[in-house]
């Protein structure tokens, strides 16, 4: 059985996916071997951001230019991402975590099971407190849901209690967290969640 965990990170543009990868890499790299694949339609902006932040050594971060719909690149035709993941796994074997960040997409986004072992979906409070109840695979089926930027709730008139109630109803017992990734709130809990899903830690 493979000892690594492939983790998909998806969510709308600006929700905090790249910020999540930045904080997770900085938190986990002390104890684990990590690599990252990012997706952008026409650029490698997210990959370059992580490289410039020095969250990992440059070779461990690959930017994929999908040239089209972000959803297609992680679901229907994920060959570009699969090849990037395999390249990293061959180069840095053994790895513990391989993160695959989707380009910004809508609530219908989901990862191919051929590409990742589990998925994290990130939404943010600034989109309004109705987002959880709108559902979609990202809200209901992801292995972990993050509601980010909770510090903006008052500013945008979002009620966190409503978001909590709707999220618990839509998730039906699946895990989720409120986060403020700009100051690291929630990173410890997310890291523990991921560590518990490493194949070597499974009972």
Curated annotation (Swiss-Prot):
It is found in: Cytoplasm. Signal peptide: none annotated. It holds the Pfam family cobW. One of its GO terms (cellular component) is cytoplasm. Keywords: Chaperone, Cytoplasm, GTP-binding, Nickel insertion, Nucleotide-binding. GO terms for molecular function: GTP binding; GTPase activity; nickel cation binding. GO terms for biological process: urea catabolic process. The keyword Membrane does not apply. CDD domains: UreG. Its main location: cytoplasm. Transmembrane segments: none annotated. Gene3D superfamilies: P-loop containing nucleotide triphosphate hydrolases (3.40.50.300). GTP binds at residues 11-18. Homodimer. UreD, UreF and UreG form a complex that acts as a GTP-hydrolysis-dependent molecular chaperone, activating the urease apoprotein by helping to assemble the nickel containing metallocenter of UreC. The UreE protein probably delivers the nickel. HAMAP family: UreG. Belongs to the SIMIBI class G3E GTPase family. UreG subfamily. Facilitates the functional incorporation of the urease nickel metallocenter. This process requires GTP hydrolysis, probably effectuated by UreG. This is Urease accessory protein UreG. It comes from Prochlorococcus marinus (strain MIT 9215).
